[in-house]
């Protein structure tokens, strides 16, 4: 059985979280570490935006600051995510890994099997979304809003037809980095408050639409699920779906210095976060 590293970082700053994901990609590309499954949280609660999003156009930055939220641009695509009551995961693995599909969409499905299995471990009837109409496929090419949980993409996880986990992917240096948010709870009004809308009517439409499109774990269970329970369920889910053994990984001081330098140079800088 192949051994991967497993890293549970706990609560970290937004800039450190993104720097560590990129550092893991760098080290794996250089053959210094095996593939990695990482779990983490955010301190403070943070709005992350996709690599291609326009921060000043899409985001109400005054509301972000007024609510004391962190803000960071991800190295991956996709739309904006409010990271608050959730567990975030990342998977770092070479594109040439055995049986890894070349297609971005199919690789996404393979890596997301661990998330699917994690939901099943929690006793939830989750399944992959597959856009089955021309309208849904068109929405993926030209999304109507900047909100990630507005609609599921190919092979994202849904329960009762509603999106419960959103993910994004990038490929650099021959390595896949996929990370995503697993929602425990969803504060709809806080989420809506940090986006710019063309009008109050547009915001009201999203307010009505969101409960039909997105759902969080604790709104579907009788007893609240903790982050610790999620860590166990999804760690075991990845181990089973990828048929791997997970070995705990702790960063060395030298590795921590590398992450902090990358954080300072890139993810903590306005030049990166507001460049579009």
From Swiss-Prot:
The record marks 163 as: Lowers pKa of active site Cys. SUPFAM superfamilies: Class II aaRS and biotin synthetases. The active site is at residue 148. Residues 31-246 form the BPL/LPL catalytic domain. GO terms for molecular function: lipoyl(octanoyl) transferase activity. It catalyses: octanoyl-[ACP] + L-lysyl-[protein] = N(6)-octanoyl-L-lysyl-[protein] + holo-[ACP] + H(+). Its EC number is 2.3.1.181. It is an enzyme of class 2 (transferase). Gene3D superfamilies: Bira Bifunctional Protein, Domain 2. GO terms for biological process: lipoate biosynthetic process; protein modification process. Keywords: Acyltransferase, Transferase. Pathway: Protein modification; protein lipoylation via endogenous pathway; protein N(6)-(lipoyl)lysine from octanoyl-[acyl-carrier-protein]. Coiled coil: none annotated. It comes from the Bacteria. Belongs to the octanoyltransferase LipM family. HAMAP family: LipM. Catalyzes the transfer of endogenously produced octanoic acid from octanoyl-acyl-carrier-protein onto the lipoyl domain of GcvH, an intermediate carrier during protein lipoylation. In the reaction, the free carboxyl group of octanoic acid is attached via an amide linkage to the epsilon-amino group of a specific lysine residue of lipoyl domains of lipoate-dependent enzymes. The reaction proceeds via an octanoyl-thioester enzyme intermediate. Monomer. This is Octanoyltransferase LipM. It comes from Lysinibacillus sphaericus (strain C3-41).
């Amino acid at each position: 059985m192949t051994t991967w590293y497993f890293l549970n970082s706990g609560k970290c700053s937004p800039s450190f979280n993104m720097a560590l994901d990129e550092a893991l990609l760098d080290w794996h590309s250089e053959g210094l570490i095996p593939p990695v499954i990482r779990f983490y949280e955010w301190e403070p609660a943070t709005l992350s935006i996709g690599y291609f999003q326009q921060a000043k156009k899409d985001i109400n930055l005054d509301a972000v600051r007024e609510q004391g939220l962190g803000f960071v641009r991800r190295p991956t695509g996709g739309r904006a995510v409010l990271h608050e009551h959730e567990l975030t995961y990342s998977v770092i693995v070479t594109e040439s890994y055995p049986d890894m599909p070349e297609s971005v969409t199919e690789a996404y499905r393979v890596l997301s099997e661990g998330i699917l299995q994690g939901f099943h471990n929690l006793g939830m009837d989750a399944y992959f979304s597959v856009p089955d109409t021309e309208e849904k496929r068109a929405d993926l090419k030209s999304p109507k809003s900047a909100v990630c949980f507005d609609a599921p993409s190919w092979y994202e996880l849904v329960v009762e037809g509603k999106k419960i986990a959103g993910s994004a992917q990038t490929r650099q240096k021959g390595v896949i980095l996929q990370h995503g948010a697993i929602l425990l709870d969803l504060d709809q009004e806080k989420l809506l408050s940090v986006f710019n809308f063309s009008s109050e009517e547009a915001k009201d439409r999203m307010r009505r639409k969101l409960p039909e499109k997105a759902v969080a774990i604790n709104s579907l269970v009788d007893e609240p699920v903790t982050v610790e329970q999620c860590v166990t369920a999804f760690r075991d889910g990845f181990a089973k779906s990828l048929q791997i053994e997970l070995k705990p990984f702790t960063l060395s001081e030298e590795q921590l210095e590398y992450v902090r330098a990358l954080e300072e140079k890139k993810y903590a800088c306005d030049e990166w976060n507001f460049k579009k």
